[in-house]
Amino acid sequence: MCSNGIFVSLLTLSLLLGKSCSETDTLHQGQFLKDGQELVSAFKIFKLKFFNFKNSENLYLGIWFNNLYLNTDSQDRPVWIANRNNPISDRSGSLTVDSLGRLKILRGASTMLELSSIETTRNTTLQLLDSGNLQLQEMDADGSMKRVLWQSFDYPTDTLLPGMKLGFDGKTRKRWELTSWLGDTLPASGSFVFGMDTNITNVLTILWRGNMYWSSGLWNKGRFSEEELNECGFLFSFVSTKSGQYFMYSGDQDDARTFFPTIMIDEQGILRREQMHRQRNRQNYRNRNCLAAGYVVRDEPYGFTSFRVTVSSSASNGFVLSGTFSSVDCSAICLQNSSCLAYASTEPDGTGCEIWNTYPTNKGSASHSPRTIYIRGNENKKVAAWHIVVATLFLMTPIIWFIIYLVLRKFNVKGRNCIRITHKTVLVSMVFLLTMIGFIRRRILSLRFGSTIDQEMLLRELGIDRSCIHKRNERKSNNELQIFSFESVVSATDDFSDENKLGEGGFGPVYKGKLLNGEEVAIKRLSLASGQGLVEFKNEAILIAKLQHTNLVQVLGCCIEKDEKMLIYEYMQNKSLDYFLFDPLRKNVLDWTLRFRIMEGIIQGLLYLHKYSRLKVIHRDIKASNILLDEDMNPKISDFGLARIFGAEETRANTKRVAGTFGYMSPEYFREGLFSAKSDVFSFGVLMLEIICGRKNNSFHHDLEGPLNLIVHVWNLFKENKIREVIDLSLRDSALDYPQVLRCVQVALLCVQENAEDRPSMLDVVSMIYGEGNNALSLPKEPAFYDGPRRSFPEMKVEPQEPENVSASITITVLEAR
């Protein structure tokens, strides 16, 4: 449907304009496109040229709508920029296809940016198409195109044209998404990203610096569940194939007057829909009812008063953040920080961010240029207003009593009746007054300190005394959590930059950071869109702080300022086990000796949790991605958000809230909500098989005729005495201790047996894996989830979430997978 509409648009333009022979749409191998020259598409719809913004010498290469389609007064901007983050500082820029077929942007004779690095000595040309797509093509001898080597549609900037995609490539895992500009005349990558959700593929989201800012809701039957996009003419189609999953924007193809609908995300995170009309002008459909929800950004942000003055730096009474911040970021960070009283941009173009924790003083030197300072004052006005209300109540009370006294005298109420009525009136007035004072006090505290009360309650639950926080410059030996300020975390991660992002899990994104003392840390930030919440955060913070073992990851502290909830861990240089185990190249690092050592470490960590720690802990989410590896490839168990503490005599419990990862959950936990130490044993058995085989447990789901999962695959080969066939191919050519490998396979199958009672304990696993006592291993029984090649899982009734209740009946009401 979308492609038909685009074809009609192109055909209409062709008939209207005809083709010009005086301009070219092609750059041949060895030719140069320089500043002042243009490539113009065949029917003059788009042009490619170098340009710069007013009052800036920086040179950019971009694709524009041609002038024929714009009013002369139109404030136009390019739809695509090749070097948005790498501007050329002078006018010497040029574009060329070199002798090896590589597409390059040059500064003088030097390579500034290599857009395509695929080498070919064949005939290669660059062509600007009438769709707005810039393609590097390898040509056959007869002049026909052989293949596309590179195209601009695979690298969108802030604008979506018909034919472009939002989603990911199934083969390369490359993501197609829009990223806002940093400022009006600064096209560098900004703070807002519009694209497909990383976890739920049929949802579009806008992220602000990695945080959920807006969501379209689920795509179902050609519509999003949130009506915002549907009602405003944002028409999409969804494609899901083996080669990728993506949304394609089509616009309103039923409107015969319009064509080339575009979507642009601006610097404030607002989606703008624009369409070109046959009257040869562009109309901006910026309707406030159609904007993506999030921060509301005004010329003067809410809660701030602007002043243009020369002020001194905040170095002594605040902090300065990197130049990659926009004014939107700066105001949002100030609002999130209860100690922030003012902010300003550090650069003339409106980027950078300077925060004051005390009011800025007008002591700038004469050499400093005036800046617009935004001072936070709205909340103080509200607090002052509430003070007036309190004073008014105190003044009104005696006046009310005096009026009552006069009324009683007028009606000749005397003696005991007068006293009784007066006492009742005084009592009611006092109750009312105290109630109002209590309410006003809470209101004032809320306005002054934001979520301070909630923070205090959370600190108490974590066992932390706030009075000692500012005195504690070093971590104590009593396992207390260190409290980090939001500013210190921002500084450590360079404002949660993409370069420092290590990955993302069910909790939220994880970043690498560097503290002021030089120590490297990993920072786990609770996402607002995360399925995990405050309970899991507290659970993990408390548990890891109290558990100390060489095979458990160490938590250093947390940050709970305002709405932020972050955990700070020791940094693991080698990421997680799945990073190596399931990658066809990186898995070669894991020889059998190292794999066995990793299994040993996991066993020791689980044995400590189940038997030897101060607390008896069931992890409930043992999997490859939760096994971190330090610089010496020693394994450490992480992610205790779902862990549960058992009493000394407690052996099992049940829950109405089943949470974990499909493929690793034991059958009794998956079906009935029952969990125990044997649940972790099952998960470990699955992980053992993955380590031995080098495959994910669910890697068979595409094979409808084959086994259900890795467990069933190994079980079938075990019954046929073909265990050697399950061993990872990367291990088969190396020197293997086959008896040890076969023993590990058998131990793993014992761990994944259907009945929990049949599975060994982790203490038994230790003796089994080393073959202590020279006892032969028992034969494993049928594994879980095995019933022929395919088996349907029992239906789950999903109801609203209820709190866990250990004494409740065994019924699953909520199923959460991660």
UniProtKB/Swiss-Prot annotation:
User: Can you say where in the cell this protein is located?
Assistant: Cell membrane
Kindly give the InterPro entries that the UniProt entry links to this protein: Bulb-type_lectin_dom, Bulb-type_lectin_dom_sf, Kinase-like_dom_sf, Pan_app, Prot_kinase_dom, Ser-Thr/Tyr_kinase_cat_dom, Ser/Thr_kinase_AS, SRK-like_kinase
Q: Which PROSITE patterns match?
A: BULB_LECTIN (PS50927), PROTEIN_KINASE_DOM (PS50011), PROTEIN_KINASE_ST (PS00108)
For this UniProt entry, which residues form the secretion signal?
1-22
What would be an example GO MF term here? protein serine/threonine kinase activity
Return the protein name: G-type lectin S-receptor-like serine/threonine-protein kinase At1g67520
Q: Where is the Protein kinase domain?
A: 496-785
- From which organism does this entry originate? Arabidopsis thaliana
| GO biological process, any | signal transduction
- Residue ranges, annotated region (CaM-binding): 585-602
